[in-house]
C-alpha cells in the first residue's frame, strides 16, 4: 500500500533564502533564467543517474518527493542531490521506491506524475535548506495576480551542452486551457501550459520533474501547481512548456490525507 502523506505542514511553502552575497553572474539557465539565492527554493532537488543529472523533483515530506512519471519509464537506481546555490552544500540520498501513476501514458504524457520514497528521511539538520512545498487542494485556483516560477538545473537552450552549477529560476505566466489546446491540440485536463509568448522563459532538458511553484499575492505560501512534463523544444515562440496539473490528479487526494504509514 502507498504511504499516506500530509501536505498541511506548518512550514510548507515558506522558503528562508539566505542573504545574497555579491552580484549575480548573469548566467542564464532554464531558458531565460537567473541564479537563485541559497534557500530560496528549498523543495527543489535534482535526481542523478550514473553521476549525471537526470531530472528534478520536489520535497513533500521528510521521506517523500514528487516528480514526473516519464523520468522513470525504466526503473533505475537513482541518487538524489539537494544542491544549494552559492555555498553549494550537497546532501545525497538514495531512492527506495518509485510509485508511477497507474494511468501514466508514455505516448501522450497524460498522468505524468510519480512519487519517490527515500531510503532514509532528511536529517533535521538540513532545515531550512530542505523544506516541503505545499500541495494545492482540488479547489485551488491560480489567477493572473499569482506569481509563478519554474526552477531547475536544466539547459539554457536546445543546443546548450553545459549545465549550471547554480539553481536557476524563471517567472512564467499560466495560459488558459483554451490557449494551451490551440498551441498543441492534445492537451488533457491533467495538463497546463506556462511560459511567455516570446519563448524567452521556459523549462528545458534536465528540468523534467521539477516544480512550477505559484505564490498568491501578498507573499503567501508557495504551492506546487505544475510538474515539468513536455513541450516542443525549449524556448520557442508561442510554444509554452507543458506541465502536469497537480490539482487534477487523484494523487493529490492521497497526499492531502492525514499522515499514516501503511508499509
Where does each model-flagged region fall?
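Extracellular "complement/coagulation-type" protease architecture
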Residues: 1-263
Amino acid at each position: 500500500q502507498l504511504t499516506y502523506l500530509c501536505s498541511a505542514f506548518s512550514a510548507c511553502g515558506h522558503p528562508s533564502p539566505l542573504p545574497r552575497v555579491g552580484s549575480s553572474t548573469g548566467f542564464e539557465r532554464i531558458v531565460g533564467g537567473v541564479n537563485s539565492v541559497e534557500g530560496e527554493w528549498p523543495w527543489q532537488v535534482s535526481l542523478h543517474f550514473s553521476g549525471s543529472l537526470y531530472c528534478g523533483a520536489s520535497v513533500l515530506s521528510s521521506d517523500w518527493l514528487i516528480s514526473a512519471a516519464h523520468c522513470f519509464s525504466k526503473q533505475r537506481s537513482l541518487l538524489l542531490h539537494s544542491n544549494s546555490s552559492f555555498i553549494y552544500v550537497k546532501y545525497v540520498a538514495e531512492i527506495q521506491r518509485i510509485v508511477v501513476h497507474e494511468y501514466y501514458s508514455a505516448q501522450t504524457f497524460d498522468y505524468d506524475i510519480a512519487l519517490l520514497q527515500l531510503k532514509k528521511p532528511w536529517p533535521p539538520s538540513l532545515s531550512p535548506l530542505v523544506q516541503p512545498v505545499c500541495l494545492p487542494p482540488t479547489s485551488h485556483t491560480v489567477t493572473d495576480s499569482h506569481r509563478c516560477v519554474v526552477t531547475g538545473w536544466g539547459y539554457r537552450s536546445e543546443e546548450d551542452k553545459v549545465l549550471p552549477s547554480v539553481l536557476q529560476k524563471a517567472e512564467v505566466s499560466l495560459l488558459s486551457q483554451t490557449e494551451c489546446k490551440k498551441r498543441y491540440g492534445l492537451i488533457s485536463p491533467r495538463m497546463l501550459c506556462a511560459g511567455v509568448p516570446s519563448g524567452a522563459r521556459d523549462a528545458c532538458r534536465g528540468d523534467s520533474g521539477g516544480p512550477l511553484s505559484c505564490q498568491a499575492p501578498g507573499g503567501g505560501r508557495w504551492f506546487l501547481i505544475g510538474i515539468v512534463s513536455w513541450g516542443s523544444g525549449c524556448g520557442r515562440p508561442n510554444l509554452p512548456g507543458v506541465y502536469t496539473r497537480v490539482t487534477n490528479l487523484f494523487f493529490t487526494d492521497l497526499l492531502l490525507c492525514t499522515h499514516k504509514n501503511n508499509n
